[in-house]
Amino acid sequence: MNEELNDARRDFLKVAAALPAVAVAPWAIAQGPVVAAGPASAPDIAPVDRVFITNEDSNTISVINPMSNAVDTTINLTSFDEDARPPFRFVTGGVMPTHAAMIHKPLYHGCIDAHGAVPNPDGTLLATSGRGSSNIYLIDAVNRRVLGNAANPQAGTTTNPERLSSGILLGREPHEPAFTRNGKELWVTLRGEDRIAILDVGQALKQVGGVPSNAVRAYVPTLNGPAQVWFSKDGKLAFVISQKVAQLEILEVNPDANGHSRPRRLRLVDLGTQDKPAFTPFQKLSPDGTQMWLSHKLADAVSVVSVKDPGTVLATLALGEMARPNHLEFVDNPRGQVTYMSLARVDDGGPNAAASSRLAIIDRSVPLAQQKVVGMVYTGGREAHGLWTNPANNLLYVAHEQDELPGTPNAGQVVCSAFDVSTPLQPKLITQIPLGSLKLPSGELRNKKSINLVYVRPGTKGQTA
């Protein structure tokens, strides 16, 4: 087994070495001067902009202010310290539980495995999924708080001022939520089942607010192990990927006069050639709305699927052995058009001579038949996962799952990396942002294992509009 892994590692490094100069010394190139194309514009940051990151092991959401590139809020999705008695505390008798053990403490009713996150079309509302707790939470993106929390009758100096909402229970393994383009519904893939929960957003807001409501409009049968839904630009089609079968399902949204869906299957696509391991966790629509890009994590590839001819696979691009792609993001600006793929694998030789993951860079300015990985850049963190750009497409944030190693500047911390992508083919690291801890009355809960990341400008139409 070790020999196989070493062979795969060598194969990956051979691929990286064979790439153009931008990939040969990715960290050095990323730090180097940009091409002579005039002065790069400053990152477009509005005062309301925030980066939201779900932390799966700590069940928290880190909120970064891109103006300062520091965490300004940590949203608490745990139920610790709502009561001063020991069974309700995070730290009991001076003993701090491990992240894995903390959710098994008696009377815990908080989130388990905070994972998915997505903004609604105008960026004022976020939906976050708890994989293990089988629910979703709604987050006020303007005030950065959980909707539905109640005043804690036992609030005091040793307890929290609020009791955590239960969110909305849906089913086993809710993975990724997605708002419809009109913002009226929230579709949540239940990865532990073979169905999608469809919520009426208006009713969901009432339900978490304590008004008796039936937020779930329907459960729609779909592929086994559905991982994510993403909608076409016109909102008429829903693309459904799976982490259990090598298939892509395309549904017609078929909205009624009130904008509520009446889904029906349009096509079922066999991806056995493109994704033999049958493990596609993430997808995203290209900026022009013509292509859906699918990340095949265990196949170490990304497929490009037509939206005009729904489901037709236009290309599949190899990313290198053991690359293990997670999420993807598009950056289109006057200096270039690229797709960035976050790679989970970790290699030596990153910033500060520390181990780091990489971003694969695919040049999309050339015809599709010529598109391929043209470079890689170290992310400055370990096991890169979620990534998202600002509205101007000149700033990029990348989340990481693993803690930084001993002897590094942010040892023991999970970090988010900020990049200047004003020249898309030459992303440059701005800074590593340690996510720190949630300060609970009984002790500090370290933010750990970042998964999804979204960049939000409340009140402005974003990528889900």
Each PLM stretch: what is its role?
Residues 37-47, 80-121, 160-181, 221-233, ...:
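Beta-rich, blade/repeat-based domains predominating
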